[in-house]
Design a protein with these regions (language model features):
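Non-catalytic accessory segments of hydrolases
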Residues: 2-5, 9-193
């Protein structure tokens, strides 16, 4: 992964590069951080920890094609390349369709296969190239019927402050994640395969 600060502005994208109906946002290079991943370039934000140190947030990173239409009950299909040159990963996206663990209301969207990454450093820019950081991947609870990995409920601050890279993952829930009908070609356990 190549990481660097971006110093020049790029045009706003009508859908955040997802082809999924997100709204356009102005690109502010002073507040956003650009990184390169296998699928293309993404930009996130720089924030401050309670101790005043900076950390970097990349939210709403799609890790599989939207599980809609023919992919609704299928195993996750990796994204080979993003649809735009620079993907906006500065905000959390929709969680997978399920029940809110607190209000019990139905929330989210079928298109919810996103992850969030919070890191105290950006590799070669902030640390020696041979420095590796511990990584914690968090899969939310909720009985496979509700919940999400958004930072509003599970704050990554303490772990990031201790030098840990934190990744939170949304996965398919309920019937969309765990329906099994072999005779209809639905293998089942898509929610576990998302993980």
């Amino acid at each position: 992964m190549v990481m660097r600060n971006v110093r020049k502005p790029y045009p706003a994208m009508s859908d955040g590069g997802l082809g999924r109906g997100s709204t356009a946002q102005e690109y502010d290079p002073s507040a956003r951080i650009m990184v390169k991943v296998v699928q293309g370039s993404i930009y996130g934000t720089k924030d401050r920890l309670p101790n005043g140190k900076p950390y970097y947030c990349f939210k709403g990173i799609p890790y599989a094609k939207a599980p809609v239409g023919k992919l609704r009950f299928a195993s996750p299909v990796p994204i080979e390349k993003y649809a735009v040159s620079y993907l906006d990963c500065s905000r959390e996206r929709s969680s997978c369709l399920g029940r809110d663990v607190i209000t019990r209301e139905i929330t989210g969207s079928e298109d919810g296969l996103f992850l969030n990454v919070y890191t105290p450093g950006l590799g070669r820019v902030d640390q020696p190239a041979d420095t590796l950081l511990p990584v914690m991947v968090f899969f939310h609870g909720g009985g496979m019927t509700g919940g999400n990995g958004d930072s509003g409920m599970y704050l990554p601050d303490y772990l990031v402050q201790e030098g840990v890279v934190v990744a939170t993952v949304n996965y398919r829930l309920g019937v969309l994640g765990f329906l099994c009908l072999p005779q209809a070609g639905i293998e089942g356990n898509a929610g576990l395969k998302d993980q």
